[in-house]
Amino acid sequence: MKVATFIEPGKMVITDTPKPVIEQETDAVIKIVRACVCGSDLWWYRGISKRESGSFAGHEAIGIVEEVGTKVTDVSKGDFVIVPFTHGCGQCPSCKAGFDGNCTNHQAAKNVGYQGQYLRYTNANWALVKIPGQPSDYDNETLNSLLTLSDVMATGYHAAATAEVKEGDTVVVMGDGAVGLCGVIAAKMLGANRIIAMSRHKDRQELALTFGATDIVEERGDEAVKRILDLTNQAGADAVLECVGTEQSVDTATQIARPGAVIGRVGIPQNPDMNTNNLFWKNIGLRGGIASVTTFDKSVLLDAVLTHKINPGLVFTKSFVLDDIQKAYEAMDKRDAIKSLVIVD
């Protein structure tokens, strides 16, 4: 089978590898239908973070269950499923509290190679999300939106939920990648009255407005702080969705949040140090982390996509076949695509 493989920064290739098989009774083998490139993949693609040469890539997909282990009872062969990057069990205290991204029973579970023809998905019971029908029952737009439920839409929703966005709030969304844009959708779903999206790129600004943003802020740093405080009559935001992960973005978030606000942080941290003084002096809460993908998909997001209440699949602005995986990464690296869709045959 074919699978996307990392060679070195800036170089992705397709390699042949044996088709995966059931190794544990909790496994499922998935035939991938659609996958994609994540903004987090660019950290190692650009050489900013380390990754072993020859490792398989991808952590977002939808597909068809090919085979299941004897202890997998929630899905069966032939089911159409969302394949999350998380592996919740649905039974531990973390999962029951709604934080399946931190499942205590499956802490070591992590699969890669979703950008391939087949995937062995470990700890499959409960974690996989069954989609009614088959891929042929849906148009391309809906399939793309279903694909976002494996990561970016659920992660954007996690940012808004942990930031405790509620009816009438003023929300700032930091980051105009797919997660940030999905955060705009999530803030609107949760009732935000004003959504300020931080973006310097026209195509992303337009999509943010389509998704429900009311204001666009192009500035960064101190200028961004001044602009947002001016927009909020010096009050600051009720909630901030931090979807970047840099030290500057977290610092900016603490400055634009009003006293008592909550920051929902889903940007992968790129610096081990963080100044928490502003959090204390302003009574600001900092939450967020690994998204509760299965929890949010099953409780709200799958229904929202199937009933066309949201259309997060619009974040896919370029489409590629699996053999063109290098081009898919290049398009995102050069910002020619907001998010690259990968069609797997």
List where the protein language model places each region:
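Glycine-rich phosphate-binding loop and adjacent beta-alpha segment
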Residues: 192, 196, 247-310, 344-345
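N-terminal Rossmann-fold NAD(P) dinucleotide-binding loop
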Residues: 180-181
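NAD(P)H dinucleotide-binding glycine-rich loop of Rossmann-like/cofactor-binding domains
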Residues: 89-174
